[in-house]
Design a protein with these regions (language model features):
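Residue-level marker of intrinsically disordered, low-complexity segments enriched
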Residues: 9-10, 25, 38, 87, ...
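Solvent-exposed loop/turn segments at secondary-structure junctions
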Residues: 45-46, 63-65, 90-94, 118-120
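Conserved beta-strand hairpin/beta-sheet module of binuclear metal-dependent hydrolase folds
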Residues: 25-79
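Acidic/polar short surface loop at catalytic or gating sites that assists cofactor/ion binding
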Residues: 2-15, 116-128
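Blade/loop signatures of beta-propeller domains
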Residues: 9-30
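Active-site metal-binding motif and surrounding structural segment of the metallo-beta-lactamase
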Residues: 31, 65-113
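Glycine-rich, histidine-containing beta strand-loop boundary motifs that form or position
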Residues: 52, 61, 86-89, 99, ...
Length: 128
């Protein structure tokens, strides 16, 4: 697990140039805890996870190939079920992994939240 907060602080405070700390957009599917109730999984499009009393709230699900890896990383952190998946936008690299999140807990599917135009984008994906 990388100390993402320390890495970003070093860059913001001018102690290191971005390239000195290695790649900034790493695709390693590793979970880093940012707080006791907050984590990020580094993926093609990162997955942000919040623990709530109702279950996990996630922002984005990565792509189709990364979704299962993101779910696995999250389940190594907590066994809490997914309650809500929020799409920041409808690009396939942010929403393509949703199937893995929906299948993670048999009998319990998360609520999906996204902009009203996401449905039209999905229809276009199905056509192409």
């Amino acid at each position: 697990m990388a100390d993402l907060l320390a890495m970003s602080t070093n860059i913001i405070d001018g102690h290191a140039a971005p390239g000195e700390l290695g790649p900034l957009n790493r695709i390693n599917h590793q979970l880093s805890e940012l707080g006791s109730e907050l984590a990020v999984v580094e993926a093609f499009s990162h997955c942000i996870v919040f623990k709530t009393d109702d279950g996990l709230v996630t922002f984005d699900t990565s792509n189709e190939h990364g979704g299962k890896k993101c779910v696995g990383a999250i389940q190594s952190w907590t066994k809490d079920p997914f309650n809500t998946v929020v799409f920041t936008h409808g690009h396939i690299d942010h929403v393509g992994g949703c199937g893995a999140f929906c299948a993670a807990y048999e009998g319990r599917k998360p609520t999906i939240v996204g902009h009203e135009n996401v449905a039209a984008r999905f229809a276009r994906y199905r056509m192409t």
